[in-house]
């Protein structure tokens, strides 16, 4: 397809059909002219239509003062008086000033407007006095006329056009005055002794005396014709780059021209909107008139591509004496007539813009399949004939000249397909094994198990602690009231049984034990039988009321099962405080004198049963 994109189309001006006024499609560029010039390098999107009649370049600025003086001197030496034309004016333009006044100006190009129903040859005929190099068509109504120098366009602009309508009368007056003055000056002889200079074709005078007399008479007249000057209004109009109407109409059209700029370019899609092609025919598509559908354009490009390939194949076949027997990719279009095809009845698809690839090469699915089968058959035949040393030129030509399809299928072997299937199976098995290993490491819970509510768990703990407190409060343990000694065997047990029991600070041990005052002076260690026979509760006394409060709280706790979680936190805080208090009590009891209270286990067990 890359080879097709670079295809160039050249249309001859004298091919029977009228030359087209502009580019057909974007992306197609005509072959460059033989006489290449740096000034011909313009925008690549504009197509050039050269002047087949030829152009002319003087090489000098004929409007300069030096050129005018030399021209007058030659006319004087040869006694030649040229006919003065009123339309021709020798005006000197300051091109540097024009470049500064008009941005992006192209002094070698004139922009011409109003060329409707005019062909390329008609425009060249209008400028035949100043033959241009080529034309760049912009649309049906305008074009750019390009010269190969910067002097000729300015002369053509001034001599073939006039001032705008509002200043046309003033320009005519100035023109008449300047032309009359030029006529008068041209009749005078030159006083300069320029006869010493000799040029080719010059003839020396036989009578020098007569020549001297003529020189003396010439000194009294002015022979040098000064260049014409523009009026201020006309000069201002040129600097503004206003459209100047042509001096004479062409085919009933009034042309307007000015200096072209770099912004005067062909718009995209102008060929599809061209009314000239619809009326006079499109030479780039066989001279077809009317609206051309996209399908017709595709078939035309395919047929043209087929002809080019056949020409190349016949050229190679003549050299190697081998006649090509294969068919091209678009072989289904062989029977299409070379004459213009009639328009098909289609919907408004011709109004839609075509992509660049669709304009050049269009692929057909049926032909693509046939092309693939044809290639496979050619490869098999080439493999069968591989034992011969001769080259298969037919196959080589076919491979080179046939464009590759836009979307070519990737050829794979059966082993590659099997390997890809095995890879997919391995990847799927690997993903399953990885998932199972992760589950085994983490450990997954059974679906039957449901996460229990945290509130229910806290409620169960609260009820269990309440039941324990209630059971422990029923037994008023003597050891809790007496205080805990380091040598007591059941210290840890009592701590776990009654965690919420609070004790009175051990300020007075005797008052807690309930000893009589008369025994205080005798000492604590008396062997009297009255102490042993007395009731344990009489000697110990009753427990204070403060110690019974925890039991009441423990009884009320199960009655309020709907308390918040803060109650459990308070219980834990109380337990920590109790541990701290127990530690302090131990330290205090250790500092006091040792109390040897002999209490038998039987009496303690009996007291428990009595309570």
Curated annotation (Swiss-Prot):
GO terms for molecular function: mRNA binding; RNA 7-methylguanosine cap binding. Residues 464-475, 602-611 have a biased composition (Low complexity). Belongs to the NCBP3 family. Keywords: Cytoplasm, mRNA capping, mRNA processing, mRNA transport, Nucleus, RNA-binding, Transport. Residues 1-44, 159-230, 338-360, 373-393, 423-568, 583-611 are annotated as: Disordered. Associates with NCBP1/CBP80 to form an alternative cap-binding complex (CBC) which plays a key role in mRNA export. NCBP3 serves as adapter protein linking the capped RNAs (m7GpppG-capped RNA) to NCBP1/CBP80. Unlike the conventional CBC with NCBP2 which binds both small nuclear RNA (snRNA) and messenger (mRNA) and is involved in their export from the nucleus, the alternative CBC with NCBP3 does not bind snRNA and associates only with mRNA thereby playing a role in only mRNA export. This is Nuclear cap-binding protein subunit 3. Residues 20-31, 196-218, 339-358 have a biased composition (Acidic residues). The keyword RNA-binding applies. It is found in: Nucleus; Cytoplasm. Residues 423-439 have a biased composition (Polar residues). GO terms for cellular component: cytoplasm; nucleus. Residues 108-169 are annotated as: RNA recognition motif (RRM) domain. InterPro entries: NCBP3. A motif (WLDD motif) lies at residues 137-140. Residues 168-179, 446-463, 501-511, 544-556 have a biased composition (Basic and acidic residues). The lineage of its organism: Eukaryota, Metazoa, Chordata, Craniata, Vertebrata. GO terms for biological process: 7-methylguanosine mRNA capping; mRNA transport. Component of an alternative cap-binding complex (CBC) composed of NCBP1/CBP80 and NCBP3.
């Amino acid at each position: 397809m890359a080879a097709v994109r670079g295809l160039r189309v050249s249309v001859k001006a004298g091919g029977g059909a009228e030359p087209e006024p502009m580019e057909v499609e974007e992306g197609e560029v005509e072959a460059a002219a033989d006489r290449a010039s740096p000034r011909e390098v313009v925008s690549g999107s504009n197509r050039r239509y050269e002047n087949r009649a030829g152009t002319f370049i003087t090489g000098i600025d004929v409007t300069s003062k030096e050129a005018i003086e030399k021209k007058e001197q030659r006319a004087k030496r040869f006694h030649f008086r040229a006919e003065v034309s009123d339309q021709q004016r020798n005006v000197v333009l300051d091109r540097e000033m024009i470049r500064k006044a008009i941005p992006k100006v192209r002094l070698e190009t004139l922009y011409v407007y109003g060329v409707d129903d005019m062909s390329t040859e008609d425009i060249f005929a209008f400028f035949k006095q100043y033959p241009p190099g080529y034309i760049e068509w912009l649309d049906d109504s305008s074009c750019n006329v390009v010269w190969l120098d910067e002097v000729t366009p300015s002369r053509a602009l001034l001599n073939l056009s006039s001032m705008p309508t509002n200043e046309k009368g003033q320009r005519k007056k100035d023109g008449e005055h300047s032309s009359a003055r030029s006529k008068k000056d041209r009749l005078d002889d030159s006083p300069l002794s320029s006869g010493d200079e000799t040029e080719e074709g010059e003839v020396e005078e036989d009578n020098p005396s007569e020549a001297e007399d003529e020189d003396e008479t010439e000194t009294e007249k002015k022979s040098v014709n000064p260049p014409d000057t523009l009026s201020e209004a006309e000069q201002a109009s040129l600097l503004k780059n206003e459209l100047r109407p042509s001096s004479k109409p062409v085919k009933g059209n009034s042309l307007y021209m000015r200096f072209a700029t770099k912004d005067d370019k062909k718009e995209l899609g102008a060929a599809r909107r061209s009314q000239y092609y619809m009326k006079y025919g499109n030479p780039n598509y066989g001279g077809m008139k009317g609206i051309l559908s996209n399908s017709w354009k595709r078939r035309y490009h395919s047929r043209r591509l087929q002809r080019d390939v056949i020409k190349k194949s016949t050229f190679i076949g003549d050299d190697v004496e081998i006649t090509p027997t294969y068919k091209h990719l678009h072989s289904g279009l062989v029977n299409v007539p070379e004459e213009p095809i009639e328009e098909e009845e289609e919907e408004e698809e011709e109004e839609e813009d075509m992509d660049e690839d669709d304009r050049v090469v269009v692929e057909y699915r049926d032909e693509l399949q046939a092309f693939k089968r044809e290639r496979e058959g050619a490869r098999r035949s080439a493999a069968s004939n591989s034992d011969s040393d001769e080259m298969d030129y037919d196959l080589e030509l076919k491979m080179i000249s046939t464009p590759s399809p836009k979307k070519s299928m990737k050829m794979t072997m059966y082993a590659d397909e099997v390997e890809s299937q095995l890879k997919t199976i391995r990847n799927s098995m690997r993903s399953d094994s990885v998932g199972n290993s992760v589950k085994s490491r983490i450990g997954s819970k059974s679906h039957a198990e449901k996460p229990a509510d945290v509130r229910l768990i806290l409620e169960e703990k609260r009820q269990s602690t309440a039941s324990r407190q209630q059971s422990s409060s029923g037994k008023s343990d003597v050891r809790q009231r007496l205080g805990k000694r380091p040598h007591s065997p059941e210290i840890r047990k009592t701590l776990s049984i009654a965690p919420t029991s609070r004790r009175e600070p051990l300020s007075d041990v005797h008052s807690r034990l309930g000893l009589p005052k008369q025994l205080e002076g005798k000492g604590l260690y008396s062997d009297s039988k009255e102490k042993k026979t007395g009731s344990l509760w009489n000697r110990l006394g009753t427990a204070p009321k403060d110690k019974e409060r925890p039991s009441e709280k423990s009884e009320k706790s199960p009655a309020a099962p709907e308390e918040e979680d803060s109650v459990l936190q308070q219980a834990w805080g109380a337990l920590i405080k109790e541990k701290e208090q127990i530690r302090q009590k131990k330290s205090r009891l250790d500092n006091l004198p040792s109390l040897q209270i002999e209490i038998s286990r039987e009496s303690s067990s009996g007291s428990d049963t009595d309570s």
